[in-house]
């Protein structure tokens, strides 16, 4: 079995065998040159130091894992009791990929994240990004039922 982190920061740290330094931005302690060194060795591709190019390289590598995975395992920001829906908030789109491309999706979360109805969810979804990153809303809000 191969486990692959899909959050970009966590993916970089997994490749580097390095612990996270921040809960929201886990690889913030690494320079782009350090990330480039890791990608060159682990991806076995020519070294790049341009950030858009490195992001594209990571997307290409991760997409291969998404489409061949038998199972995607994620957390959930919220679960709706009324519908059985899971809600995942990301800024990279990895939540949608891990919940839809693998044959099986397993969401693991605590009871404190269960909300009664979709209406209750609408209130909480506006609060989450403001308190986590200061954003009005995250780039990707994925609800899966």
Map each language-model feature to its residues.
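The feature marks the mature, well-folded catalytic cores of soluble enzymes
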Residues: 1-145
């Amino acid at each position: 079995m191969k486990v692959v982190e899909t959050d970009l920061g966590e993916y970089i740290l997994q490749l580097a065998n390095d612990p996270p330094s921040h809960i929201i931005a886990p690889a913030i302690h690494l320079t782009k040159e350090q990330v480039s060194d890791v990608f060159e060795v682990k991806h076995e591709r020519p070294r790049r130091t341009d950030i858009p190019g490195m992001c594209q390289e990571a997307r290409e590598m991760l997409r291969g894992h998404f489409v061949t995975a038998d199972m995607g395992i994620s957390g959930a920001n919220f679960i709706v009791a009324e519908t059985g829906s899971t809600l995942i908030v990301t800024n990279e789109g990895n939540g949608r990929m891990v919940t839809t491309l693998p044959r099986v999706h397993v969401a693991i979360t605590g009871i404190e994240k269960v909300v009664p109805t979709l209406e209750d969810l609408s209130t909480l979804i506006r609060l989450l990004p403001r308190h986590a990153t200061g954003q009005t809303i995250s780039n990707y809000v994925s609800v899966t039922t």
